[in-house]
Design a protein with these regions (language model features):
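Short edge beta-strands and adjacent turn/loop segments
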Residues: 9-29
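A generic structural motif
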Residues: 57-70
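Polar/charged, Gly/Pro-rich intrinsically disordered segments
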Residues: 68-108
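Non-catalytic accessory regions used for complex assembly or targeting
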Residues: 38, 50, 104-108
């Protein structure tokens, strides 16, 4: 008795990500829930921008790419069009084995 109560600090959601290099570009591949593909494009963009802001704040260089498993079991992605060929050449198993960082999502 008499001890100060521990101050509760709500932590930010943290995700495992794969920071990889493709050609001369750093990528931060973030696996997200399969329901992500059903969200409106504006919401997808907002979420991707939040991850990009968080990566920048964490000094984690690279373009954020969101990936998820679609209804056919294939990997879908949200990324710049210049990365389409590379992203079509990998799958969720590749992403899972490449996870090498954590990224806390800053919520605003």
């Amino acid at each position: 008795m008499g001890e100060a109560a521990a101050k509760r600090i709500d932590s930010m959601p943290t995700f495992q990500v794969a920071q990889v290099r493709h050609g001369d570009q750093d990528l931060i591949i973030v696996p997200v829930d399969r329901t992500f593909g059903k969200r409106p494009p504006t919401e997808q963009a907002r979420i991707q921008e939040a991850f990009q802001r968080s990566a920048t704040a964490a000094k984690l260089p690279g373009v954020v790419v969101l990936v998820w498993e679609d209804s056919r079991g294939k990997m879908a992605h949200r990324a710049p069009p210049t990365l389409n060929d590379f992203l079509k050449s990998i799958d969720m198993v590749y992403v899972a084995t490449a996870l090498n960082r954590t990224l806390s999502l800053e919520t605003r």
